């Protein structure tokens, strides 16, 4: 968490966060989630490493963190630039759904070699479930749900048909991001969509951090709204932050 909510520059890292990354920023500040995260840590283990890929495994077919919309996450004290977060595909429309075929398959798909990707990746294995693959590059993330062949081996990847209407826009953006990743090996800033509400969310996040730190209403008002307007904007005990 940001230890000094009064330092506006301490929130500069949020300027280009996507919607999924903003979700993490707010979730990691939830005390009940932090407690749930601590109790779930023995559920996961590290299978090993393959080039730039870290391989994780969950003991349960349905990880307990799904109650919070997650399959896995690193520690809540890590901000969106450094955290590893697997969102539940049922809740996160940007998770790209794909099928992996062997190289010998006669399909129109370019071979995909995970080792050729320059940015870091994490592979989460869930018993009796599909593979979950996350690419992370300087705070930008792309999450894939992959069925079929093991993606750590050379495969051919195809998207799982036309997405539903309510998922189409997010899936097309993720597919564009994946195609650029396949070509360049990186997740460029232009390939990950910044949430247009970021300036507003940054302000809300500062207010939340101030409240969590125990700051009073007048103190928050003086810092965020300017001292001369604090009493006017923040008067009245019934007004919510």
Model-flagged regions — what are they?
Residues 1-155:
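DNA-contacting interfaces and partner/effector-binding or oligomerization modules
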Residues 231-241:
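DNA-recognition helix of helix-turn-helix
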Residues 12-27, 190-197, 206-210, 238:
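Short, charged/polar micro-motifs that form catalytic or ligand-binding hotspots
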């Amino acid at each position: 968490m940001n230890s000094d909510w009064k330092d506006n520059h301490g929130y500069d890292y949020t300027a280009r966060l996507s919607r999924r990354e903003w979700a993490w920023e707010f979730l990691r500040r939830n005390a009940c989630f932090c407690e749930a995260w601590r109790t779930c840590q023995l559920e996961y283990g590290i299978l090993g490493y393959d080039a730039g890929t870290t391989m994780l495994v969950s003991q349960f077919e349905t990880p307990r963190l799904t109650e919070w919309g997650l399959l896995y996450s690193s520690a809540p004290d890590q901000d969106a630039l450094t955290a590893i977060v697997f969102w539940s595909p049922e809740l996160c429309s940007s998770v790209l759904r794909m099928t992996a075929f062997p190289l010998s398959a006669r399909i129109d798909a370019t071979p995909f070699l995970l080792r050729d990707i320059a940015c870091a990746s994490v592979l989460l294995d869930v018993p009796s479930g599909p593979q979950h693959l996350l690419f992370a590059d300087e705070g930008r993330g792309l999450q894939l749900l992959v069925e079929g062949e093991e993606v750590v081996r050379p495969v051919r990847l195809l998207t799982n048909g036309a997405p539903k209407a309510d998922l189409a826009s997010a899936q097309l953006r993720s597919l564009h991001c994946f195609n650029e990743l396949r070509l360049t090996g990186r997740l460029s800033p232009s390939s990950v969509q910044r949430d247009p509400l970021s300036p507003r969310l940054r302000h809300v996040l500062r207010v939340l951090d101030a409240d969590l730190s125990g700051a009073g209403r007048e103190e928050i008002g003086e810092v965020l709204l300017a001292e001369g307007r604090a009493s006017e904007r923040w008067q009245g005990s019934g007004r919510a932050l």
